[in-house]
Amino acid sequence: MKHFRIILASALAIAATNATAIDVNTTGSAQWVCGGAGEQERIQLKGLESEATTELMFVSGKRGGYLADVDFVVRDHKGGTELQGRAGGPKCLLTVPAGRYRVDASHEGAKRSANFQVTRAPGNPTRTVLTFPGDPSETIAPLAQEKAGVKVK
């Protein structure tokens, strides 16, 4: 967790010097950062993956176009809110304690939910992809998802 804070501080410093700002959030023991809509954000997120326990991806349609402006809430297995926010890009990296969680997300009136479990240490995040209906041509252009190993439902 200490390393994640150092890396988050570095991301904030980088973001402050670039036109693209990346939002870093902390609630209790949970930390998260969302973005990836532009190349600078993708680079910053890539640098943070080694400290994350969970990765959320928000995509649209059968071809998996990336989405931004997705509202989400992550709840623990007892239903308590662990964190909530609005993803400014298609990818969110979370650092949450080991356990079972549920993510509820909404985009333009469509709602999606998924359960996930965190059992891994930071550096090998559990990936959860939420697919929303829509035309991928109206979303952020797909970016070599096959290389990233993203499987679209």
Regions found by a protein language model. Name each.
Residues 71-83:
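Short amphipathic beta-strand segments in non-cytosolic proteins
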Residues 99-105:
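A short tyrosine-centered beta-strand micro-motif
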